[in-house]
């Protein structure tokens, strides 16, 4: 009886906080924009995002999903795994088989690392502290192919590659930091195996794909991969429509004449106003020359698909440059909505209590990724400027 009373009290308290938060949020927007304009802007922004951003992202998901499945079917993933394996131990302090997880999450999404972790033969290569850090390692490459292809579609090619290198640096920081946190909390995990040592008899099974022609294997791989891409595309719809809509309303301003008319992509410019107060921090760390750009990393904390939905608006306003694309690629890949997936991922492998440590480590990793990408892009620009006079002198 006492427990029920406590539970009902906590529910009442959380209900009050929820009502207060909703009233403050919509009250502030309605007070600045006007309630009819606010409602029209919410609906029109979400509708435009669905038609012009979500469907575009879904098409990329379908194509990249098909390519990824073809790579798996014809051994390209296995080849990449063999190539990357020697780098795992010295750089990430992880067994060589972990490289397969990097490739799989890069081609799909964060949870792909968990499907591998559930495989006991895969997990048998790890000590417990290494096994737990897999969530951070895999998340840093989540949806990497989608992010890079999307950025390249905006007309930038060198910047996404620099961002990929930055994401790798952030991954090293996040993974190593998580391992330190785990060992500090549970020193015994340094020697304990992730799963008990068991001798597994490998059964030689006649592979079905050897009985099929190359054309059928290619067709099946493309269709299955495309179907998985549709699933990813559908999964990002709530994040893009809900998170991006409200982030845009706190990022963009009124119409050109300074009034609100209920059109899409209007807002109160609260985030840029706050970012302006500490703009020197964002400019030095990330090279952001416009305070509106801070909306991308904030959104990427919860959903990278929603963060990508902000890019077309930034481009149309002229806020984007190569440096921003490099930083967005790095932080978008590294964070890739980890706040919405980390808890479930750690819970699925049985270490829910370590979620706060994993989140802290990965937050730091994302910052390292962004800062690294910014300074690498600055170095890239300086090298281009140095080489241009030399090239002109050679021509003359």
Task: Label every PLM stretch briefly.
Residues 112-177, 304-383:
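C-terminal transmembrane helix pair
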Residues 26-73, 145-163:
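Long, highly hydrophobic alpha-helical transmembrane signal-anchor segments
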Residues 67-100, 118-123, 282:
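Membrane-embedded helical hairpins/re-entrant loop segments and their flanking transmembrane helices
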Residues 384-396:
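Single conserved hydrophobic/aromatic residue that forms the stacking wall/gate
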């Amino acid at each position: 009886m006492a427990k029920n009373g406590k539970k009902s009290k906590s529910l009442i308290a959380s209900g009050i906080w929820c009502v207060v938060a909703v009233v403050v949020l919509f009250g502030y927007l309605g007070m600045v924009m006007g309630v009819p304009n606010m409602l029209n802007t919410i609906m029109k922004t979400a509708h435009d995002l669905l038609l012009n951003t979500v469907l575009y992202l879904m098409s990329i998901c379908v194509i990249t999903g098909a390519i990824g499945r073809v790579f798996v079917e014809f051994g390209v993933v296995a080849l990449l795994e063999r190539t990357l394996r020697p780098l795992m131990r010295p750089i990430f302090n992880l067994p060589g088989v972990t490289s397969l997880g990097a490739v799989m999450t890069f081609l799909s999404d964060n949870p792909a690392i968990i499907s591998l972790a559930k495989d006991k033969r895969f997990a048998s290569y790890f000590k417990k502290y290494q096994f737990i850090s897999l969530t951070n390692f895999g998340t840093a490459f989540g949806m990497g192919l989608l992010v890079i292809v999307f950025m390249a579609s905006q007309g930038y090619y060198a910047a996404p590659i620099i961002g990929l290198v930055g994401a790798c640096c952030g991954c090293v920081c996040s993974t190593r930091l998580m391992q330190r946190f785990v060992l500090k909390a549970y020193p015994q995990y340094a020697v304990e195996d992730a799963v008990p040592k068991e001798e597994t008899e490998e059964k030689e099974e006649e592979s079905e794909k050897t009985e099929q022609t190359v054309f059928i294997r290619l067709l099946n791989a493309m269709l299955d991969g495309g179907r998985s891409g549709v699933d990813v595309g559908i999964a990002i719809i709530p994040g893009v429509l809900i998170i991006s809509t409200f982030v845009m309303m706190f990022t963009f301003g009124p119409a050109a004449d300074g009034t609100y008319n209920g059109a899409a992509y209007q807002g109160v410019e609260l985030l840029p106003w706050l970012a302006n107060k500490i703009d020197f921090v964002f400019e030095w760390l990330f090279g952001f020359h416009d305070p509106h750009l801070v909306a991308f990393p904030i959104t990427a904390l919860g959903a990278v698909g929603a963060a990508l939905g902000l890019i077309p608006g930034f481009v149309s306003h002229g806020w984007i440059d190569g440096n921003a694309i490099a930083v967005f690629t790095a932080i978008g890949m590294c964070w890739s909505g980890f706040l919405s997936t980390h808890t479930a991922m750690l819970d699925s492998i049985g270490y829910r209590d370590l979620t706060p440590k994993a989140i802290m480590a990965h937050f730091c990793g994302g910052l390292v990724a962004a800062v690294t990408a910014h300074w690498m892009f600055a170095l890239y620009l300086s090298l281009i400027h140095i080489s241009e006079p030399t090239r002109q002198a050679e021509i003359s």
